[in-house]
């Protein structure tokens, strides 16, 4: 019984410590850009795959969206076209519906944001890349899924 009580106390202490951590800040394009920068700093190997996105300045995905719709307001994106046949796209969002990962997001909503890094080949009309759940406190990827969309 004493052991059970100790385990319960430890769980409460952990929950209390985690409650003090701030939620991911996607209140502005600057905050979203900082989150993307933090991701690239924590994962420098990704910059070789998406070389232009580490310097990308994010903007609201739907600037005309009403402020009541926080899911849309908390989605930022940018794109870079290094040549006529290729486009790199970055998306940072707090909207789990956007990424189709509603269940996994419930476990990490206080700590993580969605990031999608995509490469669009205009000639092949093909979109590839990955989407991931990035923990802003531990600077760790919680989940990553590859994306491939072809005609």
How does the language model describe each region?
Residues 2-8:
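Sec-dependent signal peptide recognition
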Residues 14-16:
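C-terminal motif of bacterial Sec signal peptides marking the signal peptidase cleavage site
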Residues 18-20:
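Bacterial signal peptide processing site
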Residues 22-73, 77-81:
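Short, non-transmembrane alpha-helical segments in secretory-pathway proteins
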Residues 46-49, 62-69, 89, 95-96, ...:
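Short, solvent-exposed secondary-structure boundary motifs
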Residues 71-98:
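Amphipathic, interaction-prone secondary-structure segments
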Residues 91-151:
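Extracytoplasmic electrostatic interaction patches
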